[in-house]
Regions:
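Short beta-strand-to-loop acidic/aromatic patch adjacent to the donor-nucleotide binding site
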Residues: 149-160
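Short beta-strand/loop segment that forms part of the nucleotide-sugar
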Residues: 32-41, 125
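Hydrophobic helical membrane-anchoring modules
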Residues: 1-2, 243, 250-318
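A conserved acidic beta->alpha catalytic loop
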Residues: 38-49, 159
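Short, acidic, metal-binding catalytic loop of nucleotide-sugar glycosyltransferases
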Residues: 23-34, 52-56
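Short glycine/serine/threonine-enriched helix-capping/active-site loop
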Residues: 154, 181-184, 266-268
Length: 318
């Protein structure tokens, strides 16, 4: 727990066997739940995840084909319940999970114990089919929301996000100064010195396109996936409707703007080490441009064409 706030961290991972173990080990102690989502990796990622949790106590393992149960409840489940263990998806064989704390395994502890802490921190999750980075994050978001996390951060499984600054990422949301906080590597030359010119150029193009589509004109570095969001914001935006591929981050910003949410950039230094970006900008930029054009038109329609969105708060978000 951090400042009387429960904190969940989603760690999406695809073929990150070389890094995922260190990422899990580095999760700060104030984190209540860490949802490590293996998005159908073909290397040893899953084995590395399990190796991190098996030496301790038995922990719940959720395997999801197409995500967790789509009929999740609207709020936290009662103590002792197991999110995604019941419902149509489970009945159809799409979701397998430990059902209870006795017999079939250890169920998810949906409520903290007497000391205010959750029994287990790491929750291993595995997709049976690859859904993309956004799909992995959505699965983590859904579980965190069901378990009643107040703030949910995202820390990639490639080791490029410094766990020592997680408190800085979540601070604006915890303090109530923002609904969504994200890292920004483009504040000054010292922060983006590690970025290649090609990566900088691609980021600049995507930043401009995302500003136009979202209306967040002071926002920079939209491809930065080091983020934090409040549970209330997740409920308002609607996790199920989010894009699941690499354009996930941009789609989130468009939807946040349509709902009048406050977004804050948190300065951070770029860290790459030996990891190469999975984004191929030659194909990604045109594809994302089409997505952002649709997002721009949708935002205008949602903001000014519907009566159930607070347009005053949207304008105040500038």
């Amino acid at each position: 727990m951090y400042e009387n706030t429960t904190v969940g961290v989603v760690v999406p991972a695809h073929n990150e066997a070389a890094h995922i173990g260190e990422v899990i080990e580095s999760i700060p102690s104030f984190v209540d739940r860490c949802y490590v989502v293996d998005d159908c990796s073909t290397d040893g990622t899953w084995a590395e995840i399990i190796a991190q949790v098996e030496p301790n106590v038995p922990r719940p393992v959720v395997t999801a084909d197409g995500g967790v149960d789509r009929d999740l409840p609207d709020g936290p489940v009662s103590e002792g319940a197991t999110p995604a263990a019941d419902g149509p998806a489970a009945d159809a064989g799409e979701v397998d999970t430990a059902r209870s704390s006795t017999g079939d395994g250890v169920g998810l502890s949906a409520s903290p114990g007497p000391d205010g802490e959750y029994e287990d921190t790491v929750v291993p999750v595995r997709h049976r089919v690859n859904r993309g980075r956004g799909g992995a994050i959505k699965t983590g978001y859904q579980l965190a929301f069901v378990e009643g996390m107040d703030v949910v951060a995202v820390m990639d499984g490639d080791g490029q996000m410094d766990p020592d600054i997680l408190d800085r990422i979540i601070d604006p949301v915890v303090a109530g100064d923002a609904d969504y906080a994200k890292g920004n590597r483009l504040v000054d030359a010292d922060h983006w010195a590690a970025m290649s010119r090609w990566r900088l150029f691609g980021n600049a193009v995507l930043t401009l396109l995302t500003k136009v589509a979202s209306g967040y004109w002071r926002m920079r570095d939209p491809q930065n996936g080091y983020t934090a969001v409040s549970a209330e914001t997740l409920a308002d935006v609607g996790v199920d409707h989010l894009y699941e591929d690499y354009g996930f981050l941009n789609d989130v910003l468009v939807r946040l703007r349509a709902h009048g949410k406050r977004v804050v950039d948190v300065p951070m230094t770029a860290v790459y080490e030996d990891e190469e970006s999975g984004i191929q900008y030659r194909s990604f930029v045109p594809k994302l441009s089409a997505l952002l054009l649709w997002g721009f038109l949708w935002r205008l329609w949602a903001t000014y064409g519907l009566g159930d969105l607070d347009t005053d708060s949207v304008r105040a978000a500038d």
